């Protein structure tokens, strides 16, 4: 009895303290609201102008797109209407190539071999961990929801699929890592093509009566052959930046410059200036981004197929993918960030809002890269040495959303075909989906191409990819947003884990963060500081 009586006052005291804390916070909030002035509102709107304009563009673009759908615009009219959005894509893609090279070279050159090795290892561990988690989430969700019930006969097909073997796709990945021509790597990627070739194969005789006849004819005609056709792999290429090859070269080049010490100072300063110039161009383009995103989204909504095409199975498949991506993006990634850094992930994500909306509009993690740099460095204060190293690599190989989508889509196609997958085949899908997501370049709808590898690994029909193309334009935007979020949170995690190495590097270089900020101050501010110091000096002399 005494124990329970003793606990009641304690519980009452805790409740009173909790209520007092709530009252204090409420009063503080009321005072802040009452003290808000027009200048405060103006400063808030100015600070968050980019984000507010981008969010408004998404809302207006969606409304405009659905408003124009009943008018049944022609293909030419849609292209004219989407032209402002096309301009935004071209502007961003124009900056991707110099940004990847300059940021990686300067990032690697600013770190010593020990620090860059540790940072690289942490980034790779993060990439592999989140990708594997994404694949597991996709597999579990699609097995639980089971969107592929029924038959595929009534489902709408769209487009054609180019077949590629897993071995050739893997070899293409390795080949693209080491481009023979750096100039060509700026606009072309190696890709194995297939062509039919005819071969003459001698007919083998057996011991039967027919074999005896063939032997006699063969002796008379010297040889008897049959012609067979076979698909043979031949070297080829496709248009597009070979980002993987440029990333590998830039990392190696930056590492060498960093080890050259004073001899590499001129190159280090050149690439640092190039990176700064590119980021200033990004700052200009960001003002145009809301306009481009508005027309990109509106144009895609006008262009998309009739919603009646999306049947029950495809609708359930879409919902399943969205649920999987939400679990990974809203629960897993923020939780991982909180567990490692012990910081509020939503404050960090709030600083990324414009990059995430840009990813939603452009459906390309590479095209979003300039905006992602800007958000991480200016809004979230992530060290430039980390962003320059982690972001270009992440945009190339870290694609959580794509990995989740490929594993989920493969099992959905198996369900549609009433194909029972055993445990070994599910493991095979998880491994190939992880590997294929690494090989998927940061370009729109790359997941559809690499999904052929996943389906081939377990013997599923690759033609059935056409069943999901009708909704891929929408899902591609969602998984791109997830990819960008994963890269950005990864930069925050790697910076937190590498903070000691970064501080030690600052001490070694005699270039602390405070000194660096002082060097970057405008001339007028430095002059003002000097003027304020003069009276103090005169007083001391007196």
Curated annotation (Swiss-Prot):
Residue spans, topological domain Cytoplasmic: 1-47, 109-122, 261-269, 341-345, 377-385, 495-542
Highest classification ranks of the organism: Eukaryota, Metazoa, Chordata, Craniata, Vertebrata
Post-translational modification: Glycosylated.
Result of altering residue 477 to M: Strongly decreased L-aspartate and L-glutamate uptake combined with strongly increased permeability ot other ions
Role: Sodium-dependent, high-affinity amino acid transporter that mediates the uptake of L-glutamate and also L-aspartate and D-aspartate. Functions as a symporter that transports one amino acid molecule together with two or three Na(+) ions and one proton, in parallel with the counter-transport of one K(+) ion. Mediates Cl(-) flux that is not coupled to amino acid transport; this avoids the accumulation of negative charges due to aspartate and Na(+) symport.
Compartments (UniProt record): Cell membrane
Extracellular side stretches: 69-86, 146-236, 298-318, 413-425, 460-472
InterPro entries, sorted: DAACS, Na-dicarboxylate_symporter, Na-dicarboxylate_symporter_CS, Na:dicarbo_symporter_sf
Keyword Phosphoprotein appears in the UniProt entry: yes
Signal peptide per UniProt: none
BP GO terms, sorted: auditory behavior; cell morphogenesis involved in neuron differentiation; cellular response to cocaine; chemical synaptic transmission; chloride transmembrane transport; cranial nerve development; D-aspartate import across plasma membrane; gamma-aminobutyric acid biosynthetic process
Membrane topology note: Multi-pass membrane protein
Transmembrane intervals: 48-68, 87-108, 123-145, 237-260, 270-297, 319-340, 386-412, 473-494
Domains (record comment): Contains eight transmembrane regions plus two helical hairpins that dip into the membrane. These helical hairpin structures play an important role in the transport process. The first enters the membrane from the cytoplasmic side, the second one from the extracellular side. During the transport cycle, the regions involved in amino acid transport, and especially the helical hairpins, move vertically by about 15-18 Angstroms, alternating between exposure to the aqueous phase and reinsertion in the lipid bilayer. In contrast, the regions involved in trimerization do not move.
Source taxon at top rank: Eukaryota
UniProt tissue specificity: Detected in brain. Detected at very much lower levels in heart, lung, placenta and skeletal muscle. Highly expressed in cerebellum, but also found in frontal cortex, hippocampus and basal ganglia.
Binding sites annotated in the UniProt record for Na(+) 2: 396
Binding site for L-aspartate: 363-365, 402, 443-447, 476, 483
GO molecular function annotations of the record: glutamate binding; glutamate:sodium symporter activity; high-affinity L-glutamate transmembrane transporter activity; L-glutamate transmembrane transporter activity; metal ion binding; neutral L-amino acid transmembrane transporter activity
Main location: membrane
Residues at which Na(+) 1 binds: 394, 398, 483, 487
Disease: Episodic ataxia 6: A disorder characterized by episodic ataxia, seizures, migraine and alternating hemiplegia.
Gene assigned in the entry: SLC1A3
Name of the protein: Excitatory amino acid transporter 1
Record's GO cellular component terms: basal plasma membrane; cell surface; cytoplasmic vesicle; membrane; membrane protein complex; neuron projection; neuronal cell body; perinuclear region of cytoplasm
Quaternary context: Homotrimer.
Keywords assigned by UniProt, alphabetized: Amino-acid transport, Cell membrane, Chloride, Disease variant, Glycoprotein, Membrane, Metal-binding, Phosphoprotein, Potassium, Sodium, Symport, Transmembrane, Transmembrane helix, Transport
Reaction it catalyzes: K(+)(in) + L-glutamate(out) + 3 Na(+)(out) + H(+)(out) = K(+)(out) + L-glutamate(in) + 3 Na(+)(in) + H(+)(in); K(+)(in) + L-aspartate(out) + 3 Na(+)(out) + H(+)(out) = K(+)(out) + L-aspartate(in) + 3 Na(+)(in) + H(+)(in); D-aspartate(out) + K(+)(in) + 3 Na(+)(out) + H(+)(out) = D-aspartate(in) + K(+)(out) + 3 Na(+)(in) + H(+)(in)
């Amino acid at each position: 009895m005494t124990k329970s009586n003793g606990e009641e006052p304690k519980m009452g005291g805790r409740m009173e303290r909790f209520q007092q804390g709530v009252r204090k916070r409420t009063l503080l909030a009321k005072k802040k609201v009452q003290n808000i002035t027009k200048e405060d509102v103006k400063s808030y709107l100015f600070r968050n102008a980019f984000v507010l304009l981008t969010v408004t563009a998404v809302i207006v673009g969606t409304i405009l797109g659905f408003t124009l759908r009943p008018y049944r615009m022609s293909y030419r009219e849609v292209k004219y209407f989407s032209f402002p959005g096309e301009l935004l894509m071209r502007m961003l893609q124009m900056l991707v190539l110099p940004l990847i090279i300059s940021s990686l070279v300067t990032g690697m050159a600013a770190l010593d071999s020990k620090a860059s090795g540790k940072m690289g290892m942490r980034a790779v561990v993060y990439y592999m961990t989140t990708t594997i988690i994404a694949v597991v989430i996709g597999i579990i969700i699609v097995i639980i929801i089971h969107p592929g019930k029924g038959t595929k006969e009534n489902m709408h097909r769209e487009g054609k699929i180019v077949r590629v073997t897993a071995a050739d796709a893997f070899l293409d990945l390795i080949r693209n890592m080491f481009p023979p021509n750096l100039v060509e790597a700026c606009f072309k990627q190696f890709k194995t093509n297939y062509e039919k070739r005819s071969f003459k194969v001698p007919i083998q005789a057996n011991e039967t009566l027919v074999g005896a006849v063939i032997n006699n004819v063969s002796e008379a005609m010297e040889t008897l052959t049959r012609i067979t056709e076979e698909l043979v792999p031949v070297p080829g290429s496709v248009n597009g930046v070979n980002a993987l090859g440029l990333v590998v070269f830039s990392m190696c080049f930056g590492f060498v410059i960093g080890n050259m010490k004073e001899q590499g100072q001129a190159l280090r300063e050149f690439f640092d200036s190039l990176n700064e110039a590119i980021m200033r161009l990004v700052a200009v383009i960001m003002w145009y981004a809301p306009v481009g995103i508005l027309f990109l989204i509106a144009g895609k909504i006008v262009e998309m197929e009739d919603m009646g095409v999306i049947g029950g199975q495809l609708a359930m498949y879409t919902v399943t993918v969205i649920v999987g991506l939400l679990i990974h993006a809203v629960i897993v990634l923020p939780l991982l960030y909180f567990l490692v850094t012990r910081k509020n992930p939503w404050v960090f994500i709030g600083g990324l809002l414009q990059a995430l909306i840009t990813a939603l509009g452009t459906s390309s993690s590479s095209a979003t890269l300039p905006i992602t740099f800007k958000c991480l460095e200016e809004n979230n204060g992530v060290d430039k040495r980390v962003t320059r190293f982690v972001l270009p690599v992440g945009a190339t190989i870290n694609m959580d959303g794509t990995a989740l989508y490929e594993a989920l889509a493969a099992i959905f196609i198996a369900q549609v075909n009433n194909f029972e997958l055993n445990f070994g085949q599910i493991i095979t899908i998880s491994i190939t989906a992880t590997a294929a997501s690494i090989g998927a370049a940061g370009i729109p709808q790359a997941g559809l191409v690499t999904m052929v590898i996943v389906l081939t690994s377990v013997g599923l029909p690759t033609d059935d990819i056409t069943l999901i193309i009708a909704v891929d334009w929408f899902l591609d935007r969602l998984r791109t947003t997830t990819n960008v979020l994963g890269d950005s949170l990864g930069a925050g995690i790697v910076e937190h884990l590498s903070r000691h190495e970064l501080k030690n590097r600052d001490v070694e270089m005699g270039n602390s963060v405070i000194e660096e900020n002082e060097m970057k101050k405008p001339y007028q501010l430095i002059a003002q500081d000097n003027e304020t110091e003069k009276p103090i000096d005169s007083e001391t002399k007196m």
